UniProtKB/Swiss-Prot annotation:
Pfam families: SDH_alpha. GO terms for molecular function: L-cysteine desulfhydrase activity. One of its GO terms (biological process) is L-cysteine catabolic process to pyruvate. InterPro entries: Ser_deHydtase-like_asu, UPF0597. HAMAP family: UPF0597. This is UPF0597 protein CV_1824. Belongs to the UPF0597 family. Transmembrane segments: none annotated. The lineage of its organism: Bacteria, Pseudomonadati, Pseudomonadota, Betaproteobacteria, Neisseriales. It comes from the Bacteria.
């Protein structure tokens, strides 16, 4: 191993272990549910009412999504059931043990006007705070900058925990600052298998979500619709159709409130699905063995993380597009394209999808998952044929890492006003 590999490879393993984790339900409402669950535990008494505040971006991403196990949309129900039945030790799976009675109690709390929600005047892009009351007693918990990153705990005004968000981040932080796409590729292809074998769980969890989504009872049931159109002769069978139906079905289930966890990426279940299911579909098509699948998944998820480190945690840019760039890398490798095809496919996707907006988490996210998966496979086919969007076109550069950096600039600097306008439009609809 080179000195560079000795330094970077442990960072890659830490990045995968920190960013690719199971999550039940859309992670923005779940973050508020976790804050409420932690506050309820601190209070130690039956919650009677809840005051909650979230950042503007978290408000945008939580307004239109179904909270798993509840059949109800929005942040207030997440706070209510989090306080009444959440397991604070389960973190992003905080709602995994909800009972029918707890869900009913949460809905009654909403009907009685006992849950108040507002936008917090904070600089944090990701922020969730819950104050859970019993009589005049109150416990307050705040989470900032990462979905499980607790920065404040108070009980009846007494501070139990308070720290700056930067100081509260997980011990296992990682640094991909000077990494390149080529570094990621070399790691995924040559790392000891036992150091990345855990990534196979992504295929297991997200495939189960896809199977559940194919039942047709979740969200916009796009995956199931596409399958019915195949059977009706309106859409041809084949690898592309399989990629689209399975990837989209998993997102349907995820956004439609299925009580199954997704393997997330960079704090998002849809990003985890987007980075997983196209790779799984292609691996099955080429009859890849377990090691080949694991390495393709590691490549996909780590490329997704690498690109996301160049983006804000939440922004106006739909990050399913960037997670799907990881999937394109994994698919290109499975189809024997090697690193040249990987870099070409990513460049073409930036030329294709850059600027797709995030207008909040909702059932329609599955549309964007489908679009991004299709773009990824198209870019791979182009790369295998020696074609890519070139550095002479738009924000795409000759070098893939420069193209990724340009995409990051677009999201960070160019789309800030877009984000504000999207939220205003959504708030006007309430």
């Amino acid at each position: 191993m080179s000195e560079r590999e000795v330094r970077l490879w442990p960072e890659f393993v830490k990045a995968l272990k920190q960013e690719v984790v199971p999550a039940l339900g859309c992670t923005e409402p779940i973050s508020l549910a976790l804050a409420a669950a932690l506050a309820a535990r601190e209070l130690g008494k039956a919650p009677e009412r809840i005051d909650a505040w979230v950042s503007a971006n978290l408000m945008k991403n939580g307004m239109g999504v179904t909270v798993p196990g509840t059949g109800t949309v929005g942040l207030p129900i997440a706070a209510a059931v989090g306080a009444l039945g959440g397991d604070p030790d389960a973190k992003l799976e905080v709602l995994k043990n909800l009972t029918v009675e707890q869900v009913a109690a949460g809905k009654q709390m909403l009907a009685d006007g006992k849950v108040k929600l507002g936008v917090a005047a904070v600089p944090n892009i990701l922020y969730a705070e819950a104050c859970v009351w019993h009589g005049d007693e109150c416990a307050r918990v705040a989470i900032a900058d990462a979905h499980t990153n607790v920065i404040k705990i108070e009980l009846n005004g007494e501070v139990k925990l308070k720290r700056e968000a930067a100081d509260a981040k997980p011990v296992e932080t990682y640094d991909l600052g000077d990494a390149t796409a080529r570094d990621v590729y070399d790691f995924a292809m040559r790392a000891p298998l036992d150091s990345i074998a855990f990534i196979h769980d992504a295929a297991v969890l997200n495939s189960a979500l896809a199977d559940e989504g194919m039942s047709g009872k979740y969200g916009l049931h796009i995956g199931a619709t596409l399958q019915r159109q195949i059977e009706a002769g309106l859409l041809s069978e084949g690898l592309l159709s399989n990629i689209l139906t399975r990837t989209t079905a998993a997102s349907d289930a995820r956004m439609g409130g299925a009580t199954l966890p997704a393997m997330s990426n960079s704090g998002s279940g849809n990003q985890g699905i987007a980075a997983t299911m196209p790779v799984v579909a292609v691996a099955e098509h080429v009859k890849a063995d377990r090691e080949t699948l694991i390495r393709a998944l590691a490549l996909s998820h780590l490329i997704a993380v690498y690109i996301h480190t160049r983006l804000p945690k939440l922004s106006a840019l739909c990050a399913v597009t960037t997670a799907s760039m990881g999937a394109a890398a994994g698919m290109a490798q499975l189809l024997n394209g090697g690193y040249p095809a990987v870099s070409m496919a990513i460049s073409s996707m930036i030329g294709d999808l850059a600027g797709m907006i995030c207008d909040g988490a909702s059932n329609s996210c599955a549309m964007k998952v489908s679009t991004s998966a299709g773009s990824g496979y198209k870019a791979v086919l182009m790369a295998l044929d020696g074609t890519r969007v070139t550095g002479n076109e738009g924000i795409v550069a000759h070098d893939v890492d420069v193209s990724i950096a340009n995409l990051g600039k677009l999201a960070t600097q160019g789309m800030a006003q877009t984000d504000t306008q999207i939220l205003q439009i959504m708030m006007d609809k309430r």
